[in-house]
Design a protein with these regions (language model features):
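Serine endopeptidase catalytic core focused on the charge-relay Asp
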Residues: 1-156
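Beta-propeller and closely related beta-sheet repeat lectin domains
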Residues: 4, 169-170
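A short acidic Gly-Thr/Ser loop motif
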Residues: 11, 165-167
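Short pre-catalytic strand/loop immediately N-terminal to key active-site residues, enriched for Gly-Thr
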Residues: 157-164
Length: 171
C-alpha cells in the first residue's frame, strides 16, 4: 500500500521520528503486527530536482521499520495514524520536521506535499481558507463530524493541483 506522510516534531522538540499519515493507509487485509510494521519503508527526498517531471531525480534515502503509536479509523473518526520510526533519522538525510499547534484556527493558505500513485513528490497549493467538513466516502463510510479539512486547490501552469491515491496522509 502506498501513501504519503509527514515527519512531525513533538513538544520536546527532540527530533523523535514520528510520522503522521492516514489510518486507511494501513492495509487492513494484512494484520498490523510488529513483524509487518518492521517491513514498512519510508522514503525521504523522493523528488525531482526541478519542477518538471523530466528533470533529474534527486538522491533519496530510505528507512525501514516502525511502530504504530496511535490510529483513528476513517469510519466514525478522523482517519489519523501516528507511527514512530524504529531508528533515528541520520542528520545527513536533511529531513524536515513539520510543526503543529493545538489551535482551532483554519489555515488561510498552504500546500499539500504528496506522492500521487507513489510518484515523485508533487506540491498542490491552496489560497482559500480551509474549512472543516465531514468525510463521506464509498461503502457508507462516514467520518466524524467536522473532523476533516476541506481545501480547494489552485490552478497551476500545467492545469490544476490535485490529489489521488497515494496522496492520502500528506500534510
Amino acid at each position: 500500500y502506498i501513501c504519503s506522510g509527514a515527519l512531525v516534531n513533538n513538544t520536546a522538540e527532540d527530533l523523535k521520528p514520528y510520522i503522521l499519515s492516514a489510518f486507511h493507509c494501513i492495509d487492513l487485509d494484512i494484520p498490523v503486527t510488529e513483524k509487518n510494521l518492521n517491513k514498512y519503508t519510508f522514503y525521504f527526498h523522493f523528488e525531482h530536482t526541478g519542477c518538471e517531471n523530466n528533470s533529474s531525480i534527486a538522491s533519496y534515502r530510505t528507512i525501514t521499520g516502525c511502530k504504530k503509536i496511535a490510529g483513528i479509523p476513517l469510519d466514525g473518526g478522523s482517519d489519523g495514524l501516528l507511527l514512530l520510526l524504529n531508528q533515528t533519522i541520520p542528520e545527513h538525510y536533511n529531513a524536515y520536521y513539520n510543526g503543529w499547534d493545538r489551535s482551532n484556527t483554519a489555515a488561510q493558505s498552504g500546500v499539500g506535499i504528496h506522492h500521487p500513485s507513489g510518484d515523485y513528490m508533487k506540491i498542490s497549493t491552496f489560497n482559500k481558507v480551509a474549512r472543516t467538513s465531514t468525510w463521506y466516502g464509498i461503502d457508507n463510510i462516514k467520518g466524524a463530524p467536522n473532523a476533516h479539512w476541506n481545501v480547494v486547490f489552485e490552478q497551476t501552469a500545467n492545469g490544476h493541483a490535485v490529489t489521488e491515491g497515494g496522496s492520502s496522509g500528506s500534510p
